[in-house]
């Protein structure tokens, strides 16, 4: 008798994706972050659904509805902090996932990589709109500053901004539409994640050596289900420690003040996961130039498959490229720090140097290093 999971139409799909999937035998813990991102998305959708039951997207009551959730709803404080810190956890996993993709050359899978970049943009849009919903000071001013960047687009910019706002400033219409988009986007992200997986399973997973692994594959279950489960346990332990003991560690104190259009905070800044891009935006004195640099800071990832010069896929045996990769990681951390600092010397010049270095490493130094390494190996 044939096993049901191999014949039933629905079970067959699950079987091919998570049970009998041929997987390289040598993939490391760095390959766990895909499943962890799936877990983060489930946490966010579940906690967000319960928050939406009590939240009101109205400028007069949004802030007090969040207060009501924290004070009056059963375990409302827990759900709210799970949702807020879940976003941070999502981006920690996301950046580690992207870093692993760059290090081991996973960007060679073009469709999977490009859908990953679309997923990153969708996640950033979702998180930005979610940050506006509590209607605190930083919510309001963050929304005003970031949406206002679109006015830099020639000719249609001003009309575009007013169209997004639904008026002449960030107001009730803006909050309402942001809530609607924030609610629907995670489901679009979930659908895109399925497409991401679909394309990944067309080619099979990459591995640390960056070489074809068709000759040495093992079934996903039980080997990698067990490995993923360990990752999930460690992630949840870290997550709940954070939620229960340090819930406001990554938040902004300004967001505990209700939004006031008449009072500008001394330093407007986004959440920590956008600070590197915000620092790149601020490092260019021209508004349109800054917006282009901001978009390119993410979009530059799409160029990676086209500017790879090395004949080796992974960085595992490429010491010069390894050095440049870790220099890039350090540079992104410096940009993150600079993004949270006021616009004054010496932070301005540090931000400009770090921004220039960011694009130089990706677009020039890494391709040059690949050519040098090929020459060293007489390839």
From Swiss-Prot:
SUPFAM superfamilies: a domain/subunit of cytochrome bc1 complex (Ubiquinol-cytochrome c reductase), Transmembrane di-heme cytochromes
Annotated Pfam families: Cytochrom_B_C, Cytochrome_B
Domain of life: Eukaryota
Record-level GO BP terms: mitochondrial electron transport, ubiquinol to cytochrome c
Key words of the record: Electron transport, Heme, Iron, Membrane, Metal-binding, Mitochondrion, Mitochondrion inner membrane, Respiratory chain, Transmembrane, Transmembrane helix, Transport, Ubiquinone
Binding site for heme b b566: 97, 196
Residues engaged in binding a ubiquinone: 201
List of residues binding heme b b562: 83, 182
Cofactor: heme b
Molecular functions per Gene Ontology: metal ion binding; ubiquinol-cytochrome-c reductase activity
Protein's UniProt keywords contain DNA damage: no
Membrane-spanning segments: 33-53, 77-98, 113-133, 178-198, 226-246, 288-308, 320-340, 347-367
Location within or outside the cell: Mitochondrion inner membrane
InterPro entries: Cyt_b/b6_C, Cyt_b/b6_C_sf, Cyt_b/b6_N, Cytb/b6-like_sf, Cytochrome_b, Cytochrome_b_C_euk/bac, Cytochrome_b_N_euk/bac, Di-haem_cyt_TM
Cellular component terms (Gene Ontology): mitochondrial inner membrane; respiratory chain complex III
Its membrane topology: Multi-pass membrane protein
More info: Heme 1 (or BL or b562) is low-potential and absorbs at about 562 nm, and heme 2 (or BH or b566) is high-potential and absorbs at about 566 nm.
Subunit composition and interactions: The cytochrome bc1 complex contains 11 subunits: 3 respiratory subunits (MT-CYB, CYC1 and UQCRFS1), 2 core proteins (UQCRC1 and UQCRC2) and 6 low-molecular weight proteins (UQCRH/QCR6, UQCRB/QCR7, UQCRQ/QCR8, UQCR10/QCR9, UQCR11/QCR10 and a cleavage product of UQCRFS1). This cytochrome bc1 complex then forms a dimer.
Name of the protein in question: Cytochrome b
UniProt organism field: Dipodomys simulans (Dulzura kangaroo rat)
Gene name, Swiss-Prot/TrEMBL: MT-CYB
